């Protein structure tokens, strides 16, 4: 049979031989291409499985060897604990301007009433006049000169705002008692010794807020 096939091939016209050769080469190319494609798909699948295994190993200590899992678990627990603690720490941070909002309802009402009178009533005019005279007669400092050289309406507003800040510093918490009132003054005393203008304003705020403090 092989001899007959060879004889038929010899007798075949040359153009048919070329066609058959081209067809054979095309089939070989297609077969080689399929093999490469299958190999590439297999390689991708292996890489994907390897990647999944690596990710799973990095997030689940149970898939790691026992000694490695023991090292990772404390780190995971520590991270979870720090995430739970973080909001509590943030909750404790408060700006001075919002401290008055933590006061008891009665003290909060009295504090806001007092601050409103400072900004809108004769109490505020009396306050800024007293502060101006005290600052004018005190030992000269850069801060006192700055305030005395301000335009009157701007100076009055600045003194009222500084007084409000100190009032909110003194009256805060669920219920401010006399011992709390005294303690808060002592906390800022070192600062006041260096800032004489602030000391004068703090003393006036102390005097204004004394009636709010509960025994």
From Swiss-Prot:
It is found in: Host cytoplasm. GO terms for cellular component: host cell cytoplasm. The different isoforms interact (via C-terminus) with unphosphorylated and phosphorylated human STAT1 (via N-terminus), favoring the formation of parallel STAT1 homodimers. The different isoforms do not interact with host STAT2. C protein interacts with L protein; this interaction has an inhibitory effect on viral transcription and replication. Changing residue 181 to S: Complete loss of STAT1-binding. Residues 15-22 are annotated as: Involved in self-degradation and in host STAT1 degradation. Disruption phenotype: Knockout of the 4 isoforms completely abolish the ability to suppress the induction of IFN-alpha-stimulated gene products and the subsequent establishment of an anti-viral state. Residues 12-34 are annotated as: Disordered. The lineage of its organism: Viruses, Riboviria, Orthornavirae, Negarnaviricota, Haploviricotina. This is Protein C'.
